[in-house]
């Protein structure tokens, strides 16, 4: 999502420049870049490049500035950018009245944008695009949509395969959506359990390092009571206590990265998703072959009686000669 793209001669660099300049103190560069791409798609597809891009951007910037105020958002997950994009394309009054379901009220526009983000390079018909759009609209109403879309952003190919397969397997939108949700919830549960395990370990390491620093300060304070150099040493160690938990978490992260059990668990999750993706590719290929076979009509050979009669007569004439 960070690379500049061109849609109907509209370069997203134009959008990125204004978004980054206006929100450099509020949002991460990655979030600004993602929002700019979404705005470029919306401007091109929904508004058909009218009015001028500058006017459209100015209006969107005003809405988001009003909404953010002095707030700073360091979270650069895709779901955050999506919500901010929804605020930018929604009338100010509606933003104020419906802060809790901002994504749902702009679901048509957001769903259309998501189709372009994930399926612009896929060879699909307009009816299939509409079907995928409806799947996104249904997913937008889910409570854990932010988790689903963030994971989809991290594993685009797998997400695309799952949607395409569900769309081909089920004619009913609800059934297709249920299939996608079940599959991603399974992956999310596996990943969440793994992430929580790692976070607990890092936090525990942080607490241990913090406790060690605190004991060290106490011991040095007693040992250097009344000494002039304690004025320098103790504040330094107190400073160390303040940053000890973060340091401890870094140490914990280093241990996890070099732990064979953790490596194996991460490898198992990666392998599971890879297998899932390969299975989807195989199933989609099989469905494609089946479709081609069903579309092939075998035409029975037509018998040309005149030609047969001519061949028979020629044979008779040859027989007479010999």
Curated annotation (Swiss-Prot):
Compartments, record wording: Membrane
Key word Membrane present: yes
Main location (coarse class): membrane
One matching Pfam family: RP853
A GO CC term assigned to this protein in UniProt: membrane
Keywords: Membrane, Transmembrane, Transmembrane helix
Membrane topology: Single-pass membrane protein
TM region(s), chain numbering: 212-234
Designated name of the protein: Uncharacterized protein RP853
Originating species: Rickettsia prowazekii (strain Madrid E)
Taxonomic lineage from the root: Bacteria, Pseudomonadati, Pseudomonadota, Alphaproteobacteria, Rickettsiales
